[in-house]
């Protein structure tokens, strides 16, 4: 289940861990869980997925009107402020392969404390580890970018609007 990425003249061995809570997370819970995850040693990157929380109604008769959703908040993760734009339904953590067992113990404890409603944890490859065509189109010379950005590209969005680098 380990993936090797030859990038910038080094080999990075990484494994993805997916946390799938049985309910969507509130902004406060998301903030708490992300801070606890980033306290673990060996975390490469963390991705949150979920239903979008738009600022304005995207279509229909109310198109353009503001959406005042209670979970579209600014949260603080490791001292960095970020706007939560999704109702978090899953968290994908990319970890260093050699630290997987220790990290899994920590993740299990974090989940037990914060998800009394239940959760599932999966280990595998859930993210891109090799540069995609879109990466080449967006960045050009791939050898000069941070390896954590591989596969994180939305071709139609600005990087600062779609990716927040925490660590």
Swiss-Prot record:
Any one Pfam family here would be MCR_D
Keywords linked to the UniProt accession: Methanogenesis
The Gene Ontology biological process terms listed for this entry are: methanogenesis
Q: How does it assemble?
A: MCR is composed of three subunits: alpha, beta, and gamma. The function of protein D is not known.
> Any idea what this protein is called?
Methyl-coenzyme M reductase II operon protein D
Source organism of the structure: Methanocaldococcus jannaschii (strain ATCC 43067 / DSM 2661 / JAL-1 / JCM 10045 / NBRC 100440) (Methanococcus jannaschii)
Gene name as annotated: mrtD
């Amino acid at each position: 289940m380990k993936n090797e990425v030859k990038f910038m003249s080094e080999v990075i061995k990484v494994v993805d861990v997916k946390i799938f809570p049985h309910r969507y997370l509130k902004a406060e819970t998301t903030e708490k869980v992300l801070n606890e995850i980033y306290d673990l040693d060996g975390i490469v990157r963390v991705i949150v997925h979920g239903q979008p929380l738009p600022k304005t109604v995207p279509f229909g008769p109310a198109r353009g009107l503001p959406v005042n959703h209670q979970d579209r908040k600014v949260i603080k993760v490791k001292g960095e402020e970020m706007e939560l734009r999704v109702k978090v339904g899953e968290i994908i953590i990319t970890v260093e392969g050699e630290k997987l067992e220790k990290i899994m113990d920590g993740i299990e404890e974090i989940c037990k404390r914060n998800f009394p409603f239940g959760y599932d944890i999966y280990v595998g490859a859930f993210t891109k580890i090799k540069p995609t065509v879109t990466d080449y189109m967006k960045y050009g010379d791939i050898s000069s970018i941070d390896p954590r950005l591989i596969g994180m590209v939305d071709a139609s969005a600005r990087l600062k609007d779609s990716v927040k680098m925490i660590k």
